[in-house]
């Protein structure tokens, strides 16, 4: 029997990044600081900045996905001159420190366009972007043709106000396409 693959979802919010992995039987560990989200399955309420306290107690991941809060980078939140604005990068750095310490086979770091100049200073240019989602990391390219509909939905009117977590949630289709890309790459690796 093949060992179950493990994914860690840092700053997981509602868990959108890893939903396809849950459905496929991966071991999913979601790390989130907001106690209001403890109801989300597989979520542990921990601070990524305190990672040294809990990291060695978890199974080693094949994949780490990280989506630090984007409020620091949102264009709508820039209240200061863009040339002097310096966001708090502590959560971003903690996520990157975890990735560097663990060295998983695959990792994806997601944030908004406004984060690009700041994250670029730490890990270079983004690898891929899909709609409002900018992606850095070591991962097979995600097919985005099926995600075009989502790009239109983002601006659509909703019958109710969405929570910050709902707005920030990675759509299931992105989770599915990432899982599919990793599975395809794994099959190619076995064949070579």
Describe these PLM feature segments:
Residues 10, 32, 42-45, 51-63, ...:
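Class I S-adenosyl-L-methionine
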Residues 6-52:
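SAM cofactor-binding core of SAM-dependent methyltransferases
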Residues 2-4:
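Phosphate-coordination loops involved in phosphoryl transfer and adenosine-cofactor binding
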């Amino acid at each position: 029997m093949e060992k179950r693959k493990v994914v860690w979802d840092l700053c997981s919010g509602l868990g959108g990044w890893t939903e396809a992995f849950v459905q496929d039987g991966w071991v999913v560990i979601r790390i989130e600081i907001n106690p209001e989200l403890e109801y989300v399955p597989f979520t542990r309420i921990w601070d990524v900045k305190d990672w040294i306290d809990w990291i060695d107690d978890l199974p080693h991941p094949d994949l780490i996905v990280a989506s630090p809060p984007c409020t620091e980078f949102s264009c709508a939140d820039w209240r200061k001159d863009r040339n002097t604005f310096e966001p708090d990068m502590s959560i971003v750095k903690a996520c990157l420190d975890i990735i560097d310490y663990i060295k998983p086979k695959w990792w994806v770091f997601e944030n908004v366009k406004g984060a690009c100049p700041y994250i670029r200073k730490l890990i270079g240019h983004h690898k891929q972007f899909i709609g409002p989602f900018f992606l850095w990391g070591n991962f097979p390219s995600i097919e985005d043709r099926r995600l075009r509909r989502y790009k239109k939905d983002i601006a659509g009117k909703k019958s109710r106000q969405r929570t910050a977590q709902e707005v920030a949630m990675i759509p299931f289709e992105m989770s599915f396409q990432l899982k599919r890309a990793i599975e395809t790459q794994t099959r190619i690796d076995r064949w070579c």
